[in-house]
């Protein structure tokens, strides 16, 4: 029996070493180590052995099984490595070939417009200021010459959080806060971009949340001509170098005098079309000279300092600039919309 086991070990290991595929190795494993294999048959015959021989033969049989199993495992590992090498050799990849292009996103059109305007004003010596979107009643209204019970407050329906705090209805509070920081000493040249909130019903031209950019200049000897020159620069930067602007008298509580600013239609050149509704002009923003009361409440002497301010809706500028007909497109999170503004 001992000789038989050793012979089986030698045969099995020789066949394993000669095998050229994983299937052959598996067949050898089943042939020699399976339930119907010769080693199992030998073990079944151990009952005929004496009590002294039985442990020795059992140990030998286990040793033979381990030797064969070890040879099989080693051969499997060798063949698997060879198979991987063959696959790699047959599936050679040219690493110099261009890969699949990575999908690159596009900046939102509102971001593009805000950054363009910021770059323009920074180049003119302005700084960018920001403020809280949850604002106090004082900075949103009173510091801007809209005291309690002022009739102009009815012009804006607001989202109040408490009796004295609300979501800001304009970015003008940033101007009031900034003026206070200067403690009555100019010059001040700032723009204030940010989100604002009003209780409007959402439709093609209105949104309960939108973006504004306001500008403020306070210094000695500031006049309406300075305001007009600044706004002409903005209009030509945003809508083309041949644009003209006109100022129409208006009313805002925080400026005096106040004006609405129109730009000559960039589609028809002022001849009249559907974009400008036949007038040749398109309204783009409101502006005016800073009201003396606003200067006083912020610590500036209106006898010594003057200033101008202006405010524009970013969505309106973007809609005009890119020919967008519905403000709701800006907030639908539709990648097909933003992809149209992809820049190289």
Swiss-Prot record:
EC code(s) of this entry: 6.1.1.20
Keywords: Aminoacyl-tRNA synthetase, ATP-binding, Cytoplasm, Ligase, Magnesium, Metal-binding, Nucleotide-binding, Protein biosynthesis
Main localisation: cytoplasm
Enzyme type, top EC level: ligase
One cellular component (GO) term of this entry: cytoplasm
Keyword Protein biosynthesis: yes
Subcellular location: Cytoplasm
InterPro entries in the cross-refs: aa-tRNA-synth_II (IPR006195), aa-tRNA-synth_II/BPL/LPL (IPR045864), Phe-tRNA-synth_IIc_asu (IPR004529), Phe-tRNA_ligase_II_N (IPR004188), Phe_tRNA_ligase_alpha1_bac (IPR022911), Phenylalanyl-tRNA_Synthase (IPR002319), tRNA-bd_arm (IPR010978)
An individual GO BP term: phenylalanyl-tRNA aminoacylation
One Pfam family per UniProt: tRNA-synt_2d
Superkingdom, taxonomy of origin: Bacteria
Cofactor: Mg(2+)
Catalyzed reaction equations: tRNA(Phe) + L-phenylalanine + ATP = L-phenylalanyl-tRNA(Phe) + AMP + diphosphate + H(+)
An example Gene Ontology molecular-function term: phenylalanine-tRNA ligase activity
Cofactor: how bound: Binds 2 magnesium ions per tetramer.
SUPFAM superfamilies from the UniProt entry: Class II aaRS and biotin synthetases, tRNA-binding arm
Binding site for Mg(2+): 256
Quaternary assembly: Tetramer of two alpha and two beta subunits.
Protein family according to the UniProt entry: Belongs to the class-II aminoacyl-tRNA synthetase family. Phe-tRNA synthetase alpha subunit type 1 subfamily.
HAMAP family registered for this protein in UniProt: Phe_tRNA_synth_alpha1
Name by which UniProt lists this protein: Phenylalanine--tRNA ligase alpha subunit
Naturally occurring in which organism (per UniProt): Bacillus pumilus (strain SAFR-032)
High-level lineage: Bacteria, Bacillati, Bacillota, Bacilli, Bacillales
